[in-house]
Amino acid sequence: MTNKNYLSSGLVAAATLWVSTFHVAAVSLAGEFAGKTPLQWSVGMADSQMARLGDRLAWTEGGSAKWDYTAGLFTLSLLKLDERVHQPRHLQFVTNAIGSFIPADGKIQGYKAGEYQLDAINPGKTVLALWQITKEDRYQKAAALLRRQLDTQPRTRDGGFWHKQRYTNQMWLDGLYMAAPFSAEYAGLFHEPAASLDDVAKQIHLMDEHSYDAKSGLFYHGWDAKQTQTWADKTTGCSSNFWGRAIGWYAMSLVDTLDYFPTNHPARAQIIATLQKLAKGVLQHQDQATGLWWQVMDQGGRPGNYLEATASAMFVYSLAKGVNHHYLPYEYVPVIQKAYQGIVQHFVKTNAAGQLALTQCCQVAGLGFTSNGGRPRDGSFDYYVSEPIVENDLKGVGPFILAGLELQKLVEAQAAPPTTKRKLH
C-alpha cells in the first residue's frame, strides 16, 4: 500500500473536593489559534507526518523499521484522531504500519521479550485498539505476548518494574507511560484478576514515592533502588535534574491509565491526587513569556537551556485531558491555552506546500551508558542540553495531535450549560 494515495492537503491537593465551576465563557478560551482550530492543527500535523513517512515504516529519516515506542505513540494518536474525523487514511496508515509487524501467529517481528524493555510494551496500546476494531486473532495474540512480558519483568526490592533488563534496579518516569495504560486496559478487556490493576497502581505509586521532590514540585527522571549508578544520589537514588519530557511521560501515564480504572477502585483517588500534585508543579515552572516549558524544567533561561516542544505538547495534552475528565479544575484552562498558543507560535512552521513541522524537539535522553555522541548520560544539566534538537520527532508529533484533540473538547465545552458545582473525581 502507498500511503500517499490517502493523504490530504497547586490548585488542588486532595483527590476529592468541591470547587466552584466556572462557566466556560468566564475564561476567554480561544476557538482558534493562529487561524486554525486545535482539531485542524491536529489533522494538519498528522497528515504532514504521514506524508513524510510514506509507506517506509521507518520512524526516523534514513532509519529502518522496528518495533518502537515512538511508533506506538504516533499510531495511537492517529487512531484517536480517527475517532474524531473518521478519515480512512489514518486507520489505513496504522493498520499498514503496526499490522506489518504482526503475522497470523501473533509473534511480533523484531520484538525481543528477553530484553525486558518497557518501551517495547507501548505499541501494545495500538495493538489492543486494532484488535477491538478488527477482531483479528493476530492482534489479540500479540497483545497477550506483550502482557506476558510483565509477568516476569525484573523488579526492584519493593516491586517496581526495572526499566529494562540492562538498567538493573532502575525505575524511570518514562516506563510508566510505556506499560501502565496498556496493562490497565488489557486487564479490563480480558477480565484479569483485581491484582493486575492493583499492580498498575503500585507502579505509579512507587514512582511518585521515590522520584517526587517536594521543594520544586517536580519529579526526577530516574530512581536507582541500589544507589550504585553514577547518575544516582547516594542517599535517595534519584537522578539529579528534572527533565521535561520525562515528567511529560509520567503526566500522560496518569491521565491515560485513569481511563481504565473503575471509579470504585481504591487506588483511583491516589492516582488523581498524584496528577493534581504533578499539575501544580508543572504550572509553577511554566515560562511566563511564552507559556512553554524548558528542557531542564527548573533552570529557566540558564545558558544552554531551551524551550522544548515534546514536553510542552505532553503537558498540554495531560492538563487538558485532566480538565475534560474533571480531575483538574477549570482554572487550568488559561495555562493550557497559553501553552498551546506558544507551541503553535514558536514551534510549528508551515512549508510552501502547506505541510506542518514541529521544531525544537529533544531527540533523545536517558540515564547511564553514553550518548550517540559519546557523552556520559550522567543526568547532569550539561548532558540534557547536549542531546540533538530535531524536527518532527514522533515523541512530539504524537502528543501535539493528542493535545489538539483534548483542547478541541475544551473549546466545544463553551456551549455547555453552566452548573453550580463540579466534583473532582
Segments from the language model and where they lie:
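Inter-helical turn/loop segments and adjacent helix faces that build the functional surface
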Residues: Y186-L197, T257-A269, G322-Y330
